[in-house]
């Protein structure tokens, strides 16, 4: 059965379920974690997919974010929403991986792109344009345009004001339009 990337699962009900399970007690971590995982996996995966444009790499990033949540389960305040922490963790992990990849490519040299269909070339151009944006502009666009978060929610995840998110997303859209 194909994965439906368009229908987010209800986050609030899962987080309420996690609290109902008595997530503060050590024997309920698994139940709380399962509830949060069921609700938050799709948004975390979509953010990772937007960053990597690679299904397998996105799965790895999402799993790493949840693994870090599990490793810190005793420190988590399960009465608060966990999704913002997961999204920040995913973004930071993706950024770290891109830095390592950039260093590795600098050592090895540029990769040759074999021309393909026009759609493939357009996609590569869009990816190059997207990568030319600053990390803040990329993050603001991914969170507001792809994840459909409002500026305040995106600002909380990025650690900046809502106005800064709106400004960064606007700059990013303008730069993408200019490069078309």
Residue ranges and their predicted role:
Residues 5-17, 96, 103-128, 150:
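Internal acidic/polar
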Residues 19-25, 35, 125-133:
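Short amphipathic alpha-helical boundary/capping segments
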Residues 22-46, 56-59, 70:
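A short, charge-rich alpha-helical start-of-domain segment used by transcription regulators
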Residues 46, 60-67, 71, 80-92:
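Structural recognition of an alpha-helix C-terminal capping motif at a helix-to-coil junction
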Residues 71-78, 88-109, 119:
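Arg/Lys-rich amphipathic alpha helix in sigma70-family domain 2
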Residues 91, 95, 158-180:
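DNA-recognition helix of helix-turn-helix
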Residues 120, 130-138:
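Short helix-coil-helix linker/hinge
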Residues 140-144:
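A short pre-motif secondary-structure segment
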